[in-house]
UniProtKB/Swiss-Prot annotation:
This is 1-deoxy-D-xylulose-5-phosphate synthase. GO terms for molecular function: 1-deoxy-D-xylulose-5-phosphate synthase activity; magnesium ion binding; thiamine pyrophosphate binding. The gene is dxs. InterPro entries: Dxylulose-5-P_synthase (IPR005477), THDP-binding (IPR029061), Transketo_C/PFOR_II (IPR009014), Transketolase-like_Pyr-bd (IPR005475), Transketolase_BS (IPR020826), Transketolase_C (IPR033248), Transketolase_CS (IPR049557). Pfam families: DXP_synthase_N, Transket_pyr, Transketolase_C. Thiamine diphosphate binds at residues 80, 121-123, 153-154, 181, 288, 370. GO terms for cellular component: cytosol. Belongs to the transketolase family. DXPS subfamily. Mg(2+) binds at residues 152, 181. Its EC number is 2.2.1.7. Homodimer. The keyword Oxidoreductase does not apply. Binds 1 Mg(2+) ion per subunit. Binds 1 thiamine pyrophosphate per subunit.
Length: 621
């Protein structure tokens, strides 16, 4: 499916940055309007991240117009905002395939385009990568410019300030564009600031500034006074003190939707020496009224018709696991005011909106700072509170040392509610929850649970809440639950105990998590026994011993990496028990799982009922 590009006459002339740079500057505002219109149509047909890209249209046009990409390096942070970049870098005709199996990657991806200089998906990485590229450019005397684009949300992460502190010390030439789309840093936007930014980045100002440094070099007292005077004058109209203290020259804030102002300011800044910050103010969802009014709700969208100004109504479905968690958290908070909910900027995705509204004093959004979120939970546990850290599997990777050093080592009763465990689908390899069972299983003092349905999830969360001898983790997938009837009464499970769900012969399938229904279907065809193991750690030693002694072979099934996962734990236990037994491990292969619809990926990996049955039959053939 392709669009009639004649609707976008200027965009039709700019399929690559080289073509874009041939256009007269006078047509750039029209190009921005057409690019925004094309983005509306393409995402409406394909689904994807939406509001962020609408807010970076003018910025993207200006960056590729002023900088000689891909020779000059452009590094995007996270990548939600990079759809306009993809459209302008040769992928326009394939944008309708974004996030689909075999289609355009959802984030900037090195393997996909030479314009994607750094593969991204998690926040806070851009400045570190850009700094290294700037150092390399200086070592090679390449004359290459380097730009990092980062949002104000990502600026809350500690890695960002580590990188800026280092960049200020090294003093290599680089530009950091701070895309402020929440007005969380400054509201000083207007003609005065646009003019000031162009003036302060212009040749006259910078020449005077550098010449004064040389003249005052031998007069340190006067030099320090001049520096403080300059910072004071800039500080009266711009909020750049923090960046200046880190060693950056700060310009802005300016209107991020004025493409001419962006072009002129970037032209001035392109040849400035040392690290620079350009602070721009943008509106998430710009140009599409529903997204402007509700940028969070329109952050990522399914397929929709832009002309209706409405997202399609959600189809009736079973509650999601995130909603099951959110309801449980509210239910338990009603009874215990010492329950605290912590999230690293994932309130909506983790199902915590209602909790945050009903229990604001028990709710803590740690921002995009996973390390801090985990240790915050540890500190609360020290003071007798019951912290629940709600976090995506892929983002828990960023707080792993804190889980070990600050939580498990001290046996602190922190409950980790781990969302997006297993295959998440369209967001691809940066977001698949493939490794959590493996990296948690090796941590002493951890109790790890994997529910097979929403009722088990609710009971396991309560089990973790009741457990006081160390940290617990309940790991569940993205999306709708199984339709199991939820039992409102909460009962703590016996730690480390599984259940036989089907009695068969010869083959025993040990299932961990929500692939239980597929395991049961496969077992019907094979007349196999099925155990819902429930606990990844500690394992049910008695149950495993019983199954090993009464069956010819064991099969483990999990939606986690085979290497180091629950199946590996079964093998280790059998060795300890001195019970040699053929074991087939079914799970995720030793590779990064690409993007696509979850059902497609599950089927391709042989994790549906048909695939599980076939893998077992092939193993015993």
């Amino acid at each position: 499916m392709s669009f009639d590009i004649s609707q976008f006459p200027v965009l039709a002339q700019a399929n690559t940055p080289d073509e874009l740079r041939q256009l007269p500057q006078a047509v750039l505002p029209q190009l921005a309007d057409e690019l925004r219109g094309f983005l509306l149509k393409s995402v409406g047909k394909s689904s994807g991240h939406f509001a962020s890209g609408l807010g970076t249209v003018e910025l993207t046009v200006a960056l590729h117009y002023v900088y000689n990409t891909p020779f000059d390096r452009l590094v995007w942070d996270v990548g939600h905002q990079a759809y306009p970049h993809k459209i302008l870098t040769g992928r326009r005709e394939r944008m309708h395939t974004i996030r689909q199996k075999g289609g355009v990657h959802p984030f900037p991806w090195r393997e996909e385009s030479e314009y994607d200089t750094f593969s991204v998906g998690h926040s806070g990485t851009s400045i570190s990568a850009a700094l290294a590229m700037a150092v390399a450019a200086e070592k090679e005397q390449a004359g290459r410019k380097v730009v990092a684009v980062i949002g104000d949300g990502a600026m809350t992460g500690g890695m960002v300030f580590e990188a800026m502190n280092h960049a200020g010390d090294l003093h290599n030439d680089m530009l950091v564009v701070l895309n402020d789309n929440e007005m969380s840093i400054s509201e000083n936007v207007g003609a005065l600031n646009n003019h000031l930014a162009q003036l302060m980045s212009g040749r006259f100002y910078t020449t005077i500034r550098e010449s004064s440094k040389k003249v005052l070099k031998g007069m340190p007292v006067i030099k320090e006074m001049a520096k403080r005077t300059e910072e004071h004058l800039k500080g009266m109209v711009v909020p750049g003190t923090l960046f200046e203290e880190l060693g950056f020259n700060y310009i802005g804030p300016i209107d991020g939707h004025d493409v001419d102002a962006l072009v002129e300011t970037m032209r001035n800044m392109r040849n400035l020496s040392g690290p620079q910050v350009l602070h721009i103010m943008t509106k998430k969802g710009r140009g599409y009224e529903p997204a402007e009014k509700d940028p969070i709700g329109w952050h990522a969208v399914p397929k929709f018709d832009p002309s209706t100004f409405e997202k399609p109504a959600a189809k009736p479905s079973d509650p999601t696991f995130s909603e099951v968690f959110g309801k449980w958290l509210c239910d338990i908070a009603e009874k215990d005011e010492k329950v605290l909910g912590i999230t690293p900027a994932m309130r909506e995705g983790s199902g915590m909106v209602e909790f945050s509204q009903r229990f604001p004093k028990q709710y803590f959004d740690a921002a995009i700072a996973e390390q801090h979120a985990v240790t915050l939970g540890a500190g609360f546990a020290c003071e007798g509170y019951k912290p629940v850290v709600a976090i995506y599997s892929t983002f828990l990777q960023r707080g792993y040392d804190q889980m070990i050093h600050d939580v498990a080592l001290q046996r602190l009763p922190v409950l980790f509610a781990i969302d997006r465990g297993g295959i998440v689908g369209a967001d691809g390899p940066t977001h698949q929850g493939a490794f959590d069972l493996s990296f948690m299983r090796i941590v002493p003092n951890m109790v790890i649970m994997a529910p097979s349905d929403e009722n088990e999830c609710r009971q396991m969360l309560y089990t973790g809440y009741c457990y006081n001898d160390g940290p617990t983790a309940v790991r569940y997938p993205r999306g709708s639950a199984t339709g199991a009837k939820q039992v409102e009464t909460m009962t703590a499970m016996p730690i480390g105990k599984g259940l036989i769900k089907r009695q068969g012969k010869k083959i025993a399938i040990l299932n961990f998590g929500t692939l239980l229904a597929s395991s049961l279907t496969a077992a019907e065809a094979l007349d196999a026994t099925v155990a819902d193991m429930r606990f990844v750690k500690p394992l049910d030693v008695e149950l495993v011993k019983q199954l090993a002694e009464s069956h010819d072979m064991l099969v483990t099934v999990e939606e986690n990496a085979i290497m180091g996962g629950a199946g590996s734990g079964i093998l280790e236990l059998l060795q300890t028990l001195k019970l040699p037994k053929p074991v087939l491990l079914i799970g995720l292969p030793d590779e990064f799982i690409k993007h696509g619809a979850p059902d497609e990926i599950i089927s391709e990996l042989g994790l549906d009922a048909t695939g599980i049955q076939k893998q077992i039959e092939d193993f015993i053939a």
